[in-house]
């Protein structure tokens, strides 16, 4: 998938947000400034969250209320020490969990999640989705085919 600008990236996030269910997990990867938080802003809109979405870089976790709670984590600063936060509280907290830099968690990742790698390109963003587990596969299918 490819998006030409921030508006398209947010719009795709919003489409995914409409499809999300309780305990869905999304892992976002990409270099600094790739658009991870921008994508999450759209996703939050799809979850009917009206609060301003900010990067959790320095706070590690931000929580928002909408159709489902959104737990927005940035684990870059915990340097692979998943034990420094109670991941289970978010992963099984009845909401949607978005983890920026989630690939750094290694074995601490849940069994099922949808991963999105955002790559900067000159005129936009190249998006690579990878589904792990049947729920994530279904979610990706719905996102790609508008089911």
Give residue spans per PLM region.
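N-terminal pre-Walker A segment at the start of P-loop NTPase domains
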Residues: 1-15
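Hydrophobic anchor at the beta1->P-loop junction of P-loop NTPases
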Residues: 26-28
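P-loop (Walker A) phosphate-binding loop of NTP-binding proteins
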Residues: 31
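Short phosphate-coordinating micro-motif centered on Lys-Gly-acidic
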Residues: 45, 89-147
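Short beta-strand-centered segment that lines the nucleotide-binding/catalytic pocket of NTP-utilizing
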Residues: 49-64
